[in-house]
Regions:
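A short linear-motif detector with a strong N-terminal bias
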Residues: 3-7, 23-25, 54-56, 129-133
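CE4/NodB-like, metal-dependent polysaccharide N-deacetylase domain
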Residues: 4-39, 94-102
């Protein structure tokens, strides 16, 4: 797993994007989310769907505004049902949470590379990356992390014989690639 999984993912994404090289990757084990959420002081969300995890004592109700504690954040990100296309709901929760997380972490670091380094040191054991720390910090501060900088590959989820399958809308993907790589510059 770990590094090999990341390298395979990079190759698959590059292939999907017509051979465009992927400059780097950062992946984190979910157990690191407890630490990140704590460093961020929690993340406030409007709960997108009911999420329960009795083992963690989590019972979130759709529509409530909630500052997620560490266990709630973990459950909110991991929760999934067996319903068709449930992965899409999970992705929506992940995007929502990540936007709030990076807002909070950026506010805590406030351009202070030493504070960012301390945060990184606390989660380093959970991270797999081929990117140098200073570049990660620089890119996150420069790039920002909001809904305008997140793209969803267009396509359709269909039920196969045993599992859901996602079929990419190649024309729509091409449009996004053109928008991101050419219109942004």
């Amino acid at each position: 797993g770990l590094r090999n999984s990341c390298q395979r993912t990079v190759q698959t994404v590059s292939d999907l994007f017509g051979g465009i090289p992927i400059a780097g990757y950062v992946a984190m084990n979910m157990d690191g989310m407890y630490i990140l959420n704590s460093l961020a002081g929690g993340v406030e969300v409007e709960v997108l769907e009911d999420v329960t995890n009795p083992e963690l004592g989590v019972n979130l109700k759709k529509g409530e505004k909630k500052l997620l504690n560490d266990q709630e954040a973990y459950a909110y990100l991991r929760y999934r049902t067996k319903e068709f296309a449930a992965a899409n709901l999970r992705l929506d929760r992940e995007k929502q949470y990540l936007i709030g997380l990076f807002e909070n972490l950026n506010a805590k670091a406030a351009g202070d590379e030493k504070a960012a380094m301390n945060m990184y040191d606390m989660v380093e054991d959970y991270i797999v990356t081929n990117v140098q720390f200073d570049r990660i910090v620089e890119d996150l501060m420069e790039y920002g992390f909001d809904e305008n900088n997140m793209y969803e590959i267009p396509g359709e989820t269909m039920m196969g014989k045993n599992f859901e399958q996602f079929f990419v809308d190649k024309e729509g993907l091409h449009d996004i690639i053109m928008q991101v790589l050419y219109e942004s510059f």
